[in-house]
Amino acid sequence: MKTFLNKIILIIIFIFPSSIWGKDVLLQSTTSTKNSGFYSYILPIFKNETGINVKVVAVGTGQAIRNAENCDADILIVHAKSDEEAFVENGHGIKRHNLMYNDFVILGPSEDPAEISNSQSAEEALNSIFKFGYSFISRGDNSGTHKKEKNLWENAQIEISDYSGKWYKETGSGMGTTLNITAELNAYTLSDRATWITFKNKKDLKILYEGDKNLFNQYGAILVNPERCPYTNLKESKIFLNWLLSKNGQETIQKYKVNGIQLFYPNAN
């Protein structure tokens, strides 16, 4: 009888997600937030206050959204607003909330051979890279950063796919790998500021262009819709979301710094 019951328990564990057995929350999020140390900072604070453990899967925004659409998530934190809104409109998420922001920066070799540092806009900077034909390294992974980069090329009226494999090279990888390749090739790239600040292998790279309003980088948070994903851990993930949006959570986000530099700025709604 005991053996039979053990088999039944194993079958149930196999069929149903682990989140319904405990307090773990499965968070699909970006490499930029995890690699910056953000979650290593805030999640222990949240767990200490609530007893709830949050497990993070860090991938590009596009992949994170696909994973959540496949019910492999309880909550989503990414940075591609139009895709986030579509996620909710298509019934996969309950509601999108602004959570925090920072910005993107254009990096390149310190001597700046494409002369982008005096540009008046991000699009002008990209046009200079295009004009000189200097190497630009793209993530090429459908991440939030990649989506922003493609949007900037479009605004600059450059059909970037025409130059793929020439001076425009795609890594198909995360920001860390892309930065390493950019540093090795002494090329240009677009990065979120948080990853750049925490990146160790800077070599001769530096920020050459920043501050354009089009480089704004908004992060959103969305609970997965239990009507689409009935086994989602809605109870604990809602506690986590409410904490992130609360005064306490927002102050915790604001306090996270690396080498005295604030990486994310809370702006919950």
Predicted regions and their residues:
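Serine endopeptidase catalytic core focused on the charge-relay Asp
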Residues: 106
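Bacterial N-terminal signal peptides that target proteins for export
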Residues: 1-9
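Short, conserved active-site loops that position catalytic residues or coordinate cofactors/metal ions
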Residues: 71, 102-103
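Exported/periplasmic ABC-transporter solute-binding proteins
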Residues: 22-53, 62, 66-67, 72, ...
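Acidic, polar ligand-binding/catalytic clefts
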Residues: 75-101
